[in-house]
């Protein structure tokens, strides 16, 4: 189906290598989101993988693809329109935020990852910008952007260096300075830990304007729970994060294990998190400055192919 079958409206999103428009399908009058990707800015293999993944996935907490087509220099992905906007853009406007709300968001993310990992898909770029809300009125999450994702099998493990620095797992960073070592879907679980930490206090566990210091803190999992911001957060929540921000990937909780953690199953704390609103606003300013400063450098594109090797235990 050519682009002429759609009426383009306003731009609703922009990434390092793509632009997203609100569109209406002329025949059905239904609205969709159209992601337009410049072929010159992305590798052919990466684009093919993203399309293959989008065709394959079907889960209530993952943005669903309607169809795709291409021109000489562009790829067009027509996907489900989610109208709630990026998660953090929405919650930054809330006057208060509770541990229960953070749990419900994390739970939905975990459900999407249990599904993805069960069919051999690793997202590899979990960050707040890739978590969208389906409607403006609730906190139903939809995971998006599979541009760096990979399909893996039992005997295929990743060695490429990609992701977003503040959220990337230690084993991925190790591939920059050391001989590449294999890693698995555990990289996604580190991202869940970082996102959950931010949801509960409004700032990230790892941050430095000096990227070398940032990497050092990630590689050693140097983070804490400052009492001024974490004093009212449950011990179960802290334990949950500790189980995910574990340097050794084989000791890190899987998506299924995390979904069965007591914090996810039992937590119902509705007391507003202290200082949360001020901190999340400050963090959003920092994220925007990072994007302006680094631009595409915030995302590492794959620089090697997956390899048929077993991971080192």
Swiss-Prot record:
Residues reported in the UniProt entry to bind ATP: 12-20, 35
One cellular-component annotation, GO: cytoplasm
Active site (catalytic residues): 125
Superkingdom of this protein's organism: Eukaryota
The keyword Transmembrane helix is assigned to this record: no
Annotated GO MF terms: ATP binding; myosin light chain kinase activity; protein serine/threonine kinase activity
Family matches, as SUPFAM superfamilies: Protein kinase-like (PK-like)
Enzyme class: transferase
Gene Ontology BP annotations: signal transduction
Pfam families (alphabetical): Pkinase
Activity regulation: Does not have a calmodulin-binding domain.
EC number, as in UniProt: 2.7.11.18
Catalysed transformations (reactions): L-seryl-[myosin light chain] + ATP = O-phospho-L-seryl-[myosin light chain] + ADP + H(+); L-threonyl-[myosin light chain] + ATP = O-phospho-L-threonyl-[myosin light chain] + ADP + H(+)
Keywords: ATP-binding, Kinase, Nucleotide-binding, Phosphoprotein, Serine/threonine-protein kinase, Transferase
The Protein kinase domain, residue ranges: 6-264
Function: May phosphorylate a specific serine in the N-terminus of a myosin light chain.
Family indicated by similarity: Belongs to the protein kinase superfamily. CAMK Ser/Thr protein kinase family. CaMK subfamily.
Name the record gives this protein: Probable myosin light chain kinase DDB_G0292624
């Amino acid at each position: 189906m050519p682009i002429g079958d759609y009426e383009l409206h306003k731009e609703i999103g922009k990434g390092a290598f793509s632009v997203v428009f609100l569109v209406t399908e002329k025949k059905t009058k239904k609205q969709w989101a159209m992601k337009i990707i410049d072929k010159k800015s992305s590798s052919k293999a990466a684009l093919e993988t993203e399309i293959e993944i989008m065709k394959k996935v079907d889960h209530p907490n993952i943005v669903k693809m309607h169809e795709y087509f291409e021109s000489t220099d562009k790829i067009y992905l027509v996907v489900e329109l989610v109208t709630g906007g990026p998660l953090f853009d929405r919650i930054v406007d809330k006057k208060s935020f509770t541990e229960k709300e953070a749990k419900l968001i994390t739970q939905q993310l975990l459900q999407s990852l249990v599904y993805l990992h069960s069919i051999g898909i690793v997202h590899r770029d979990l960050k707040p910008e890739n978590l969208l809300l389906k409607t403006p009125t609730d906190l139903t999450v939809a995971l998006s952007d599979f541009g760096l994702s990979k399909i893996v099998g039992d005997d295929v493990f990743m060695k490429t260096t990609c992701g977003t620095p503040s959220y990337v797992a230690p084993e991925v960073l190790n591939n920059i300075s050391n001989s590449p070592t294999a890693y698995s879907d555990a990289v996604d679980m580190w991202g869940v830990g970082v996102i959950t930490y931010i949801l509960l206090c409004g700032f990230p566990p790892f941050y430095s304007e000096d990227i070398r210091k940032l990497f050092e803190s990630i590689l050693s999992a140097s983070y804490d729970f400052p009492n001024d911001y974490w004093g009212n957060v449950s011990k179960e929540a802290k334990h949950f994060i500790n189980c995910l921000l574990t340097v050794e990937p084989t000791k890190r909780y899987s998506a299924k294990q995390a979904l069965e953690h007591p914090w996810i199953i039992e937590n119902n704390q509705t007391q507003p998190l202290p200082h949360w609103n001020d901190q999340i606003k400050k963090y959003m300013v920092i994220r925007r400055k990072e994007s302006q400063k680094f631009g595409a450098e915030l995302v590492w594109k794959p620089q090697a192919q997956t390899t048929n090797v077993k991971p080192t235990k």
